[in-house]
């Protein structure tokens, strides 16, 4: 038992040290210098194939109350994690690009070779109808309540904006800010920018900044 406890202590201490040192180069920085250094830290994230992201989401969005299920980001519904919609089956799940791939045109050419397209930090499980309803809309408060089939959701939508349920607003905002920081136009990648107000695709922008800051 002592050996197990000692090993656990070493592992925990090592992980804490790694976490502490991860941002060490940012100490004393602010403004654009801080942003540039944060970008340098995260720009070499490990890329996975688009197929592999299904496995990642099955783990990342697992239903803690039912490990066989996955939680859908916009409805909060729990469904079988292996019910993946290969042909847009209405009761199955597929992958939502939270920063829409059309906002930056990073689905052009062979999208499966584009890091921004396959970046698991930007993917969430949704059902087909909610994926279609959200589409390329910017994030903003307000609109009409969203029905998923005959079921009422806690989301709201207009012709140009989408408001997710309260429980995931912070997650959504941080995913968007990650994409803004990670993809700055280097090595042929898109230069993604969060802006105030509404945007038009394929411009590499998404809104609305003040609302996303509020959600964060």
Where in this protein do the model-derived segments appear?
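Domain-level detector of nuclease and nuclease-like folds
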Residues: 87-216
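N-terminal module-boundary/linker segments of secreted carbohydrate-active enzymes
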Residues: 17-80
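Short secondary-structure junctions and interdomain/linker hinges
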Residues: 11, 45-49, 80, 134, ...
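Alpha-helical transmembrane segments and their juxtamembrane interfaces
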Residues: 12-16, 107
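Sec-dependent N-terminal signal peptides
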Residues: 4-13
